Curated annotation (Swiss-Prot):
Protein name, entry field: Adenylate kinase
Binding residue positions for AMP: 31, 36, 57-59, 85-88, 92, 160, 171
Native source species: Desulfitobacterium hafniense (strain Y51)
Family: Belongs to the adenylate kinase family.
Residues annotated to bind Zn(2+): 130, 133, 150, 153
Length: 217
């Protein structure tokens, strides 16, 4: 299976990626992991990426695309792969098409996990952390017995600044603005598999497997 995994923050991509790579015995390729591996290996492109990252700059497309090309050419990708976090733009998607053509590979599908915005915001803003012991709770999935009090030590629970409603809304807006053209691009190519992420984890996985193996959207 050669696939791209897409979905907004809070859609549960990480959980699905872990299950898919185990099921299909394929590598999970995320841009962050690729950059780290290329830097560790000391490749020319890895060193170039490190310069930008150390300066706090975005790594330019030609470097990112070069690192992706090197990674997909490795033997463990011959039976398939799950790309996560790449491509992010239509320009990167075009470049990926060229890479796959050179490697004589076809993309089997683009999995897009969809969850209503209200649910995403609930997931993204629900986390609470204990100031004393660092214990983590979620107001929906794993709530404390008493609101704002840690079950373990009685410490005060607080919400991190990057878990606030305003921050979460901004993250979703940035994601939607950036990826909508990409979703349209893959829909036009007939590769987009739209998956309902607002159901239990096992059902989401089953829907992905059905869509990839039987071609149902």
């Amino acid at each position: 299976m050669r696939a791209i995994l897409m979905g907004p923050p809070g859609a549960g991509k990480g959980t699905q990626a872990a299950d898919l790579i185990t099921r299909y015995q394929i590598p999970h390729i995320s841009t962050g992991d690729m950059f780290r591996a290329a830097i560790k290996a000391g490749t020319a492109l890895g060193m170039k990426a490190k310069e930008y990252m150390d300066a706090g700059s975005l790594v330019p497309d030609e470097v990112t695309i070069g690192i992706v090309a090197e990674r997909l050419a490795e033997p463990d990708c011959s039976k398939g792969f799950l790309l996560d976090g790449f491509p992010r733009t239509v320009a990167q998607a075009d470049a990926l098409d060229k890479i796959l053509t050179q490697l004589k590979m076809n993309l089997d599908g683009v999995i897009n996990i969809e969850v209503p915005e209200a649910k995403l915001l609930e997931r993204l803003t629900g986390r609470r952390i204990c100031r004393q012991c660092g214990g983590t709770y979620h107001m929906v999935f794993n709530p404390p017995a008493a609101e704002a009090v840690c079950d373990k030590c009685g410490g005060e629970l607080y919400q991190r600044s990057d878990d606030t409603l305003e921050t979460a809304k901004n993250r979703l807006q940035v994601y939607n603005d950036q990826t909508q053209p990409l979703i349209d691009y893959y829909r036009e190519k007939g590769l987009l598999k739209e998956i309902n992420g607002d159901q239990d984890i096992a059902q989401v996985l089953q829907d992905i497997v059905d869509a990839m193996e039987h071609g149902h959207d």
